[in-house]
Amino acid sequence: MAGLLSTFDTFSSRRSESINKSGGGAVIPGQRSTVSVFVLGPSVTDDADKLSIATTFLAHSLDTDKQHSQRGGFLVSLLAMAYSSPELYLTTNGVNADVKYVIYNIEKDPKRTKTDGFIVKTRDMEYERTTEWLFGPMVNKSPLFQGQRDAADPDTLLQIYGYPACLGAIIVQVWIVLVKAITSSAGLRKGFFNRLEAFRQDGTVKGALVFTGETVEGIGSVMRSQQSLVSLMVETLVTMNTARSDLTTLEKNIQIVGNYIRDAGLASFMNTIKYGVETKMAALTLSNLRPDINKLRSLIDTYLSKGPRAPFICILKDPVHGEFAPGNYPALWSYAMGVAVVQNKAMQQYVTGRTYLDMEMFLLGQAVAKDAESKISSALEDELGVTDTAKERLRHHLANLSGGDGAYHKPTGGGAIEVALDNADIDLEPEAHTDQDARGWGGDSGDRWARSMGSGHFITLHGAERLEEETNDEDVSDIERRIARRLAERRQEDATTHEDEGRNNGVDHDEEDDAAAAAGMGGI
C-alpha cells in the first residue's frame, strides 16, 4: 500500500516532466520578421546629438501610425545606446526565434545641410529616404517627458549632469515599464510611478526627464505586442555578470529594476510557499491539502528545471506559466493567504477575494496563525537551546498580544466587503443541523436571532453561502454603514450586562440581515 501511495504522490511531478520533455524529431524553424535597428556610428561624438537621437528613438516608438514591429525596433535601438558596442549587445542577447535584427549605422556628415547632418548608411550604401523618414519633421501627439509640459530644457540638464546620466534616466524608465507591462497592464501607470519614486529620490531620474503617463502606456503596449523585445531585455538580465567590478551606474540600476522583474506574475506561487509551507504549522497534515502540496512540489521541480530563466517564465510567456496560477492549488493557497493576512499586515491589501478561494481554509489559516502554540517552531527549539521556562513565557506574551482579538479578516478585492466583524466566532466544524438550519434560515427569525446572540454573534459559513445569492453589489456601501452602526450598538449593549430578556428580544431584526449580508458579499 505504501508503494501505491508513493506512486500517487509522485504522479503530478512525473506527469509535468513527461509533458515538458521533448518528443524528438526534426526542429522546423518558424517564420521570422525583419526588424530595423539603428546604432550610432563613430562620427557621432557630440553629447547633444546623442541625446537628440535618443529622444528621436523614443518618439518613434510612441508613434501609433507605425507598425508595432517598427516601434519595437526603436526601443531596441534606444536600449542598445547604453553600450559601447551595440552590435555585440544584439549578437549576445538578441538571438530570437521571432525576429531578425538588421543593423543600420547613423553617421554625422558636416557637409550635409538637411536632417541635421545625419545620414543612415551601411558599409556599402547610404539610405537617403530612410534618413528623411527617421529625422524628418515629426509631430508628437503628447509630450514625451513631464518636463516638456513645464518648459524645461533637456539641454540644460545635459550641461549640468552629463550625457550618461540623462541617457540612463531614459533607459531606466523603459526598464521600469517592463515590471508591470506584461503581468499587470491595468495597473501599469500606478505601478510605474511607484517604482520610479526610489530612482527620483536618489537622483537617478531628474524631474524634467520623467515620462508622462501617455509615454508609459505607449511603451507598455509595444512590450505586450513584441515578445522579442521582452526576450531581449530578459536575456540582458540573465547574461549580465553581476560579479564584475566594473559595472556602469546604468547597469547597476538595470539590475535593481531586474529585482522587481524577477518572479513577476508568480506572487501567488511564492506567497503560498512562504506562508503556507515554510511556516510549517500542523495544518499541513490535513488530508485535503495533500493533493495541493503534491502539485506545489511538482511546480517547484518545474521552476528549478528552467534554470536562470525561471524567474521570468511569466513575462516570457513560457507555455508552463499557467500551471503556476493559484487556481491549480486552491486549498493550499487559501490556507496560505489566511496565514499571510495575520502575519503580514501588508498582505491584507492583497487581492484574495477570488472565485477559487476556499473560505474554510482561508479562515483556518487565520486561526492557526493566531494560535500562540502554532507560532512556536519546534524545529528551532533544540538548535537555539530554548528552555521550558522561556517557552512558557513566550507563550504567555503571545497570548497577551493576541488576546481579545477575535476579528477575522475578510477576503479583499472582487465583491468582498473589506471589513471585519469584531469578536465573531467562526465555526469550522461540520454541523449536525438540518439543511435548513445549517444555512441559518429557520422558520422563526426571532429564534434565529436569539441563537445568534447567544453564541457570541455566531454566523455560519453555510449561511454566508446562502445569503451570497441574495445580496446585490449595489448594497455594499449601505451594508458597510449599517454594520458599523450596529456593531457600535452591539458593543454598547455588551457593556451593560445582565439586561432583561425582553430587551434582547426587541432588537431590530435588520441587524442580523446586515451582518449576514456582509458575510454573503465577501465571506467571514
Curated annotation (Swiss-Prot):
Its biological purpose is as follows: Forms the helical nucleocapsid (NC) in a ratio of 1 N per 6 ribonucleotides, protecting the genome from nucleases. The encapsidated genomic RNA serves as template for transcription and replication; encapsidation by N is coupled to RNA synthesis. Forms the encapsidation complex with the phosphoprotein protein P. Before encapsidation, the newly synthesized free N protein, so-called N0, is chaperoned by P.
Q: Which GO terms describe its cellular component?
A: helical viral capsid; host cell cytoplasm; ribonucleoprotein complex; viral nucleocapsid
Output the superkingdom of the source species: Viruses
Further remarks about this protein from its record:
Most abundant protein in the virion. Since the viral RNA genome consists of 15,383 bases,there are 2564 molecules per encapsidated genome.
Question: Which is one Pfam family of this protein?
Answer: Paramyxo_ncap
- Renumbered residue ranges of the record's region Homomultimerization: 440-461
Which residues lie within the region annotated Ncore? 1-404
Chain intervals for the UniProt region annotation (Interaction with the phosphoprotein):
462-471
What is said about its interaction partners and assembly?
Answer: Homomultimer; forms the nucleocapsid. Binds to the viral genomic RNA. N0 interacts with the phosphoprotein (via N-terminus); this interaction allows P to chaperon N0 to avoid N polymerization before encapsidation. Interacts as N-RNA template with the phosphoprotein (via C-terminus); this interaction positions the polymerase on the template.
Span list, region Ntail: 405-524
Q: Where in the cell is it found?
A: Virion; Host cytoplasm
Q: Name one GO molecular function term.
A: RNA binding
- Kindly list the positions annotated as binding RNA: 180, 190, 195, 260, 350, 354, 356
Record keyword ATP-binding present: no
State the family it belongs to: Belongs to the paramyxoviruses nucleocapsid family.
Write down the species. Sendai virus (strain Ohita)
Give the primary localization class. virion
What keywords are annotated for this sequence in UniProt? Capsid protein, Helical capsid protein, Host cytoplasm, Ribonucleoprotein, RNA-binding, Viral nucleoprotein, Virion
| Name of the protein in question | Nucleoprotein
> What's said on domains?
Ncore is globular and carries regions required for self-assembly and RNA-binding. Ntail is an intrinsically disordered monomeric domain in the C-terminus.
Give the compositionally biased regions (Basic and acidic residues): 487-508
Which residues lie within the region annotated Disordered? Answer: 487-524
